[in-house]
Amino acid sequence: MPYRILFVCTGNTCRSPMAAALLENKQLPGVEVKSAGVFAAEGSEASVHAKMVLKEKGIEAAHRSSQLKKEHIDWATHVLAMTSGHKDMIVERFPEAKDKTFTLKQFVSGTDGDIADPFGGPIEVYRAARDELETLIDRLAEKLQTEQ
């Protein structure tokens, strides 16, 4: 079964594009990845620090932000939000997505918890977010490969 993973954060310039780039970098067969934001401006690049901390891991992030739309929801098999607030907003706007929408932490480890927004912080805060995401994306990749 192909997986179409949609990562969602606020502005689609930090957390969700980092998560998407980390998962795409694994080049898992049968896994497609997109990202969007609940309050995103269309067409912005990923933040400078987000691109820098990905580059430290050898990952180039060619990304343009996108506002979350019905087409994203219809495309996705799994909608993975960065926070419970994002998850609640997604389900409120798109009730049909309820059964496929989770926080990333909930989906990979069954625990509640948000991924802190590094927006506007120093590069160390972005590194911490990247490292947390990297651990979660490793678990996500294992889960997807096990379920295929």
UniProtKB/Swiss-Prot annotation:
Instruction: Spell out the molecular function terms from Gene Ontology.
Output: protein arginine phosphatase activity; protein tyrosine phosphatase activity
The chemistry this enzyme catalyses reads:
N(omega)-phospho-L-arginyl-[protein] + H2O = L-arginyl-[protein] + phosphate
Species of origin: Geobacillus stearothermophilus (Bacillus stearothermophilus)
Q: What protein is this chain from?
A: Protein-arginine-phosphatase
The effect of T13I is: Strongly decreases p-Arg phosphatase activity and markedly increases p-Tyr phosphatase activity
Into which EC class is this enzyme placed?
hydrolase
Instruction: Identify the InterPro entries for this entry.
Output: LMW_PTPase, Ptyr_pPase, Ptyr_pPase_sf, Tyr_phospatase_low_mol_wt
Family matches, as CDD domains: LMWPAP (cd16344)
List the EC numbers from the record.
3.9.1.2
Q: Which residues form the signal peptide?
A: none
Q: Where does this protein hold substrate?
A: T10, G11, N12, T13, C14, R15
Practical use:
Therefore, this novel tool for the selective enrichment and subsequent MS analysis of arginine phosphorylation should facilitate the investigation of this highly overlooked protein modification, in particular in eukaryotic samples.
Q: Which UniProt keywords apply?
A: Hydrolase, Protein phosphatase
Q: Which PANTHER family match?
A: LOW MOLECULAR WEIGHT PROTEIN TYROSINE PHOSPHATASE, LOW MOLECULAR WEIGHT PROTEIN-TYROSINE-PHOSPHATASE ETP-RELATED
Q: Where is the active site?
A: C9 (nucleophile), R15, D117 (proton donor)
Effect caused by changing D117 to A/N: Mutant does not bind to the arginine-phosphorylated substrate
Site (Important for substrate discrimination): give the residues: T13
Which Pfam families does the UniProt record give?
Answer: LMWPc (PF01451)
Say which family it is in.
Belongs to the low molecular weight phosphotyrosine protein phosphatase family.
Return the SUPFAM superfamilies for the record: Phosphotyrosine protein phosphatases I
State how it assembles: Is present in solution as a mixture of monomers, dimers and higher order oligomers (trimers and tetramers).
Q: How is its activity regulated?
A: Irreversibly inhibited by the synthetic inhibitor cyc-SeCN-amidine, which inactivates the enzyme by inducing disulfide bond formation between the two active site cysteine residues Cys-9 and Cys-14.
User: What's this chain's function?
Assistant: Catalyzes the specific dephosphorylation of phosphoarginine residues in proteins. Probably counteracts the protein arginine kinase McsB in vivo. Exhibits almost no activity against pTyr peptides. Protein arginine phosphorylation has a physiologically important role and is involved in the regulation of many critical cellular processes, such as protein homeostasis, motility, competence, and stringent and stress responses, by regulating gene expression and protein activity.
